[in-house]
Amino acid sequence: NLIDFIWKGDGFPTRLPDSIIYDISDKNFDNLKNLEKIDKITVEMKNDVNSVAYLLHPKEQLRNDLIIYHNGHSEYDGGKKQIRFFLDKGYTVLVFSMPLTGMNNEPIIMLDGKKTKLEDHNQFKFLESDSFSPISYFVEPIAVSLNFIDKNFEYTNYHMIGISGGGWTAVIYPAIDQRISHAFSVAGSLPLELRTQERDAGDYEQTLPELYLIANYYDLYVLASFGTDKKLTQVFNYYDECC
């Protein structure tokens, strides 16, 4: 199944983040009027790839639900308009970016005896082995961060919103984690047979045969919306210049 493929038999992650820095300062978010504080969550993974997420707490918490906002390939503050919207509504917001983007690093590793900088998702195919799938880079940080939140907070529901690559993540992640109640995927995915234009081809993670032989996109849509109080909403804009 999906979890076995992603974590090669090790099971769904139960660990906690490698680092939590509480109440940090980031000038890029200074103008969010209902922002009380930011906690920085770092998850370290194989080949020195990391994930840095921000947990943004509202001054006035009017809702007891957590919003997971995934920027995709954009800079970590690229979704500030959407983040502001949810903060102003009184939600706590957990912000992620895709691997190798945003605040996440681009490590230099040894690959076939040469120093190689990881800066593109299509390089991940060279890291595959019988004991490791790079698909874990896309979903493990969310799982590990939610483990921390489970342990330290008592939110009623977790909802997820993502655009572009974040929209793809908002499809696959709820398919493997029942903790996500309602997911919104914006310009996030198309079944492979509908990708008739070059711009729709997608990166490594969008087209990996071994992954989609286990669960194709239709399967993922069902899995992401199956269960008590689970929903998946996909948004496609006809004149979308993003993706």
How would you label these PLM feature ranges?
Residues P13-Q61:
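N-terminal cap/lid segment of alpha/beta-hydrolase-fold proteins
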Residues M45, Y69-S74, N237:
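Glycine-rich His-Gly loop
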Residues L56, D65-G72:
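The conserved beta1-alpha1 loop
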Residues R63-L66, K89-T92, Y155-Y158, D177-H182, ...:
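Loop/turn elements at helix/coil->beta-strand transitions in domains of secreted/extracellular proteins
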Residues H70-E140:
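Cap/lid segment of the alpha/beta-hydrolase catalytic domain
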Residues S97, F184-A187, V235:
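Alpha/beta-hydrolase-fold catalytic nucleophile elbow
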Residues A143-Q206:
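Primarily recognizes the serine-hydrolase "nucleophile elbow" in alpha/beta-hydrolase
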Residues P191-C243:
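The feature captures the conserved acid-bearing segment of alpha/beta-hydrolase catalytic domains
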